[in-house]
């Protein structure tokens, strides 16, 4: 099982985390939010260290759903990137059975779910994992009867045991997702994506490529930088820009951004801002697309500084280049390795979605 140390999340400021580098102030409200998040994650990690051991910290992230239950003695981990589900417990098998059922039947609404507490996630009549996992008989897991029978089968036939470094014994099951689970999740959001694409004039395949790279279509996605949801919008940077564009004050709340419709609208709005404001002077549409992708990750200012410290000069230089040259520079010269890799990943994902449309 893949382990995620909380401290390893600190350096990564995922999508929209740098906005436009236009001198945005980190105000008192943001400072309080950040301090609150630090306290919460500190308490959370202390509980995990105490129960699971110092090398067993597993936390929710952009492409990983992680939920602790039973006072942190049971946990469920859905890797949306790797396509695998692991559910494990240090308690009795009834707890494991319950966790399997609740994980398979969890809903898609992340607004009311606190991933940093140990309560059960409600069972939904419209499970988010429906179509992404099948039981031992190849059935879709659509209701509590099927989920319960599958949980019983897993415990009787697929149960595994491991010992933690702190001496505790863990019993767990592993459930693979179907081969095309990413595409199944993507289809769930196509109506919202198409609506936003038409509204803001942004290519549908670009939105899909960014969303896959950001969250692998995980509606519960969160990063330590407090990037939220499917398109990993950071409230105090890109979120503020989007609200300002819409004539609103302040910034979107976490609950607001955990709504898929709001999140997709905010992410695509930010792409519109990049396209029509921060990178407006770039004339070649392909060069602009490369710059937009890179800027979604590292900020428009950081992208332009790759070419020149002066914005107008940077845009002039970009306009003198072929798109292939712009792409090569952004994927080899950009000072952020994350930004370099980001453009490679999104461009590849976008091409895949273009072919499948």
Curated annotation (Swiss-Prot):
Gene Ontology MF, one: hydrolase activity, acting on glycosyl bonds
Cellular component annotations (GO), alphabetically ordered: cell outer membrane
Entries under InterPro entries matching the protein: Lysozyme-like_dom_sf (IPR023346), Murein_transglycosylaseC (IPR023664), Murein_transglycosylaseC_N (IPR024570), Transglyc_AS (IPR000189), Transglycosylase_SLT_dom_1 (IPR008258)
Lipid bilayer topology: Lipid-anchor
Any single GO BP term: cell wall organization
Lipid group attachment sites (S-diacylglycerol cysteine): 16
Signal sequence interval, chain numbering: 1-15
EC number(s) from the headed UniProt entry: 4.2.2.n1
PANTHER family membership: MEMBRANE-BOUND LYTIC MUREIN TRANSGLYCOSYLASE C, SOLUBLE LYTIC MUREIN TRANSGLYCOSYLASE-RELATED
Name of the featured protein: Membrane-bound lytic murein transglycosylase C
Source organism: Haemophilus influenzae (strain 86-028NP)
Organism classification: Bacteria, Pseudomonadati, Pseudomonadota, Gammaproteobacteria, Pasteurellales
Gene name linked to the record: mltC
């Amino acid at each position: 099982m893949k382990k995620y140390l909380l401290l390893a999340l600190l350096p990564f400021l995922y999508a929209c985390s740098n906005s436009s580098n236009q001198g945005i102030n980190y105000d008192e409200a943001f400072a309080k939010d950040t301090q609150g998040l630090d306290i919460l994650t500190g308490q959370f990690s202390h509980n995990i260290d105490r129960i699971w051991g110092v090398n067993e910290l597993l936390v929710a992230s952009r492409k990983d759903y992680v939920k602790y239950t039973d006072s942190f003695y049971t946990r469920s981990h859905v890797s949306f990137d790797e396509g695998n589900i692991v559910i494990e417990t240090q308690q009795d098998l009834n707890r494991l059975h319950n966790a399997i059922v609740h994980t398979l039947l969890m809903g898609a609404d992340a607004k009311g779910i606190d991933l940093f507490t140990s309560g059960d996630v409600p069972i939904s009549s419209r499970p988010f994992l429906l179509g992404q996992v099948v039981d031992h008989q190849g059935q879709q897991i659509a209701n509590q009867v099927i989920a319960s029978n599958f949980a019983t089968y897993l415990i009787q036939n697929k149960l595994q045991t491991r010992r933690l470094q702190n001496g505790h014994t863990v019993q767990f099951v592993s459930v693979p997702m179907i081969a095309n689970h990413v595409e199944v999740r993507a289809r769930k959001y196509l109506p919202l994506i198409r609506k936003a694409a038409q509204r803001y004039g942004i290519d549908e395949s670009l939105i899909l490529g960014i969303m896959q790279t950001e969250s692998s279509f995980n509606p519960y996605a969160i990063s330590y930088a407090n990037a939220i949801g499917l398109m990993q919008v950071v409230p105090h940077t890109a979120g503020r820009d989007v609200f300002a564009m819409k004539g609103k004050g302040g910034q979107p709340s976490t609950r607001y951004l955990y709504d898929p419709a709001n999140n997709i609208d905010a992410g695509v709005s930010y792409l519109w801002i990049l396209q029509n404001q921060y990178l407006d002077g770039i004339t070649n549409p392909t060069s602009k697309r490369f710059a937009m992708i890179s800027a979604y990750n590292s900020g428009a200012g950081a992208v332009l500084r790759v070419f020149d410290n002066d914005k107008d000069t940077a845009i002039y230089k970009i306009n003198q280049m072929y798109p292939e040259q712009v792409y090569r520079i952004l994927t080899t010269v950009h000072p952020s390795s994350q930004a370099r890799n980001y453009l490679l990943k999104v461009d590849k994902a976008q091409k895949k979605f273009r072919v499948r449309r």
